[in-house]
């Protein structure tokens, strides 16, 4: 009710949530409709080629109920940009190196192997791996927009041209071969108690 009041009073425009499972988003929609409250406009889940689990339930739910999906982690913390070579050696300045914990837990042997193949695919089509990672996420069905967390203007300049790019069918299929739809090789939901999983190496 508090969020409904904030919207109706003009203090905020929209309501969103982050890293919620499909059932929790659906529960929120049902409560809003039964009580005539303003309902969720967006959900902000982790989503990248290495962790595609939201495609199983959350994406179809969002499409049906017109919920925007503003996803985070499109570059998989740099794994899809080819920054990692081994699971136990983190690039200087990376979140895995600086903070460890659940950030480091997202780095998997399988994820790194996929990242290296992904880098080759990007080179083959003539763009950077970071650009391809963002492009793949941007052009997936049901995704409203991916969030980017660049720390430098240089990185931003690399990614901005992706706005004008379109993912072709052949590249999409090649990505599906690397990590099939709905599956995962790295756990980016590892801060969510309802969706933690272990990646078997």
Which sequence ranges carry the predicted segments?
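Glycine/proline-rich, positively charged
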Residues: 1-53, 57
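Short acidic/polar active-site loop segments enriched in Thr and Asp
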Residues: 13, 38-41, 68, 128, ...
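Conserved, mostly hydrophobic/aromatic
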Residues: 15, 43, 62, 69-72, ...
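Active-site-adjacent beta-strand anchor residues
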Residues: 18-19, 73, 127, 146-149
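Glycine-rich beta-alpha junction loops
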Residues: 21, 47-51, 73-80, 136, ...
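Aromatic-lined glycan-binding groove of carbohydrate-active enzymes
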Residues: 54-94, 128
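Terminal-tail/helix-coil boundary detector
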Residues: 64, 88, 92-120, 124, ...
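Short catalytic/ligand-gating loop segments at beta-alpha or beta-beta junctions
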Residues: 126-134
């Amino acid at each position: 009710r508090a969020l409904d009041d904030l919207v109706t009073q003009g203090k905020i425009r929209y309501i969103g949530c982050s890293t919620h499972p499909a059932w929790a988003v659906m529960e929120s929609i049902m409560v809003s409709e039964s009580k005539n409250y303003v309902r969720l406009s967006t959900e902000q889940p982790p989503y990248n080629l290495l962790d595609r689990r939201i495609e199983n339930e959350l994406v179809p739910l969002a499409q049906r109920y017109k919920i925007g999906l503003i996803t985070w982690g499109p570059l998989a913390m740099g794994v899809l940009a080819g920054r990692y070579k081994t699971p136990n050696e983190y690039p200087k300045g990376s979140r895995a190196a600086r903070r460890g914990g659940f950030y480091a837990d997202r780095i998997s042997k399988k994820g790194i192997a996929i990242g290296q193949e992904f880098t080759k695919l990007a080179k083959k089509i003539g763009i950077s791996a970071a650009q391809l990672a963002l492009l793949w996420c941007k052009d997936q069905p049901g995704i409203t927009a991916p969030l980017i967390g660049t720390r430098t203007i240089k990185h931003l300049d690399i990614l901005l041209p992706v706005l004008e790019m379109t993912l072709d069918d052949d590249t999409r299929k090649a990505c599906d071969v690397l990590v099939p739809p709905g599956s995962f090789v790295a756990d980016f939901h590892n801060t969510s108690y309802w969706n933690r999983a272990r990646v078997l190496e």
